[in-house]
Amino acid sequence: MSSLHIYNSLTRTKEPFKPIHPGLATIYVCGPTVYGHAHLGHAKSYVSFDVVVRWLRHVGEEQGYKVRYVQNITDVGHLTDDADEGEDKIQKQARQERIEPMEVAQYYTRSFYEDMDRLGVERPNIAPTATGHIPEQIALVERLIESGHAYESNGNVYFDVNSFEGYGKLSGRTDQEALQSGGRVAERSDKRNPSDFALWKKAEPGHIMKWQSPWGEGYPGWHLECSAMAMKYLGDTIDIHGGGMENKFPHHDCEIAQSEAATGKPFVRYWMHNNMVTVDGVKMGKSLKNFVNLKELFGKFDPLVIRFFILQSHYRSPLDFSEAAIRASQSGFEKLQETYKRLVESAEGKGQLDVATFEQKITDALNDDFNTPVAIAVLFEFIKALNGALDKDGLDAASKSGAQNLFDSYAGKVLGILKSRDELLAGESGESAQTLNDVMAVLLELRKEARASKDFATSDKIRDLLMERGIEIKDTREGATWSKKKA
């Protein structure tokens, strides 16, 4: 496949990618609701879209366009389920922890970015928050009321789904199917239609996060923020909108309805949806209490091993989690690092390697809807050929330079699964790094047991001895984490 093709969830076909505006590709990805620490499901989504953005930038360098990437932070308005009823998730967490809702949001926002940084996920160009864009959301609601697509009822504002002919076109869900699915649509007496969704909610007594609006004190509905912020920073029509497959309905269908009703223009050209992480075939999630906290995983595995594990499956394929599966990925990750180190340290020889053929195969894989598992498979074909050449006659200067460039460009810059050259040449091998992770997991468990039995002397001694050796322990609500102190 010579040019980039993207699977469009709306048309259910692969389509050639061409930005709307010459010189600029725009992408919006639904960000996290910050009421808890990130888990492996978040990692799959944001690592997958990180590669999407990296590859777009790689292609854009050749085709003359830049990429503007927006990923929001939902810090208000996401209810405890997808219906219009229930308690705001952040407010609920604040009540449980007996702190201010914004303290919850900011604490878990910092935690989210810490985890993404360790996974090598690059920051978006713009990371807007819902609470920082209340005026824009109110303005969008006013436009929808003026155009007859929304109505106020008892301080609430609802989108009239019957006013928008294309409602449900992304998921293919009908209003009747939505009603029969259970839990997705709440039936209220102040709605014209049970399927109408909330744009603005009246704040009940005791609701903490609320703002003044033309309809009284209230707060925005879950779906509103993404439309308002995407259009503010990327325009009425954006190139790519990404998110989890579970967000097709109702979230993305509602985004389409309210955005296109307001502007009269197509909201998104290419819809992309990543699949879920499963545990024994069941979706991972906080509500099912089967999620795996990233901070806990980082205590057992190098974060880049987890990234490598994620990218060995296609973003549209489910990823079944087990520690055994990550350990299996670890050997491949270590081989990648060791081969790169061997290449850099190798003496100049006489052998040649057809690097360009491997580069083209990797390019073709990534141009085929960002097919990372095929790209990684080709990378290991290259590693096999490279090691064979190094075993035989070594590589001449041109082949060695080309091989290093392939590693740097594709394994490093695009896939993000290659440690830096300085780290590899000066640091530990993958095996010794994993040994350190294993030892630290044991020490943190011993310290946890000491604290539980109120043996604070032992707990503090473990912490202090590790600190002397350049390892810092940080106690969080979810347990202790560790990191090496920067020199």
From Swiss-Prot:
Return the cofactor note field: Binds 1 zinc ion per subunit.
Q: Which UniProt keywords apply?
A: Aminoacyl-tRNA synthetase, ATP-binding, Cytoplasm, Ligase, Metal-binding, Nucleotide-binding, Protein biosynthesis, Zinc
Task: Give GO MF terms, alphabetically.
Answer: ATP binding; cysteine-tRNA ligase activity; zinc ion binding
InterPro entries attached to this UniProt entry: Cys-tRNA-ligase, Cys-tRNA-synt_Ia_DALR, Cys-tRNA/MSH_ligase, Rossmann-like_a/b/a_fold, tRNA-synt_1_cat_dom, tRNAsynth_Ia_anticodon-bd
* HAMAP family in the cross-refs: Cys_tRNA_synth
- Please provide the Gene Ontology terms (biological process) for this protein: cysteinyl-tRNA aminoacylation
Where along the chain is ATP bound? 286
Q: Where is this motif: 'KMSKS' region?
A: 283-287
Q: Where in the cell is it found?
A: Cytoplasm
Q: Which reaction does it catalyse?
A: tRNA(Cys) + L-cysteine + ATP = L-cysteinyl-tRNA(Cys) + AMP + diphosphate
Record: residues binding Zn(2+) = 30, 226, 251, 255
The similarity comment for this entry is: Belongs to the class-I aminoacyl-tRNA synthetase family.
Single GO cellular component term: cytosol
Which Pfam family, giving just one, matches this sequence?
A: tRNA-synt_1e
Annotated motif 'HIGH' region: location in the chain? 32-42
Main localisation, per the record? cytoplasm
Spell out the SUPFAM superfamilies in the cross-references: Anticodon-binding domain of a subclass of class I aminoacyl-tRNA synthetases, Nucleotidylyl transferase
Q: Per its record, how is this protein called by name? A: Cysteine--tRNA ligase
Q: What is its EC number?
A: 6.1.1.16
Q: How does it assemble?
A: Monomer.
Q: Which cofactor does it need?
A: Zn(2+)
Q: Which gene encodes it?
A: cysS
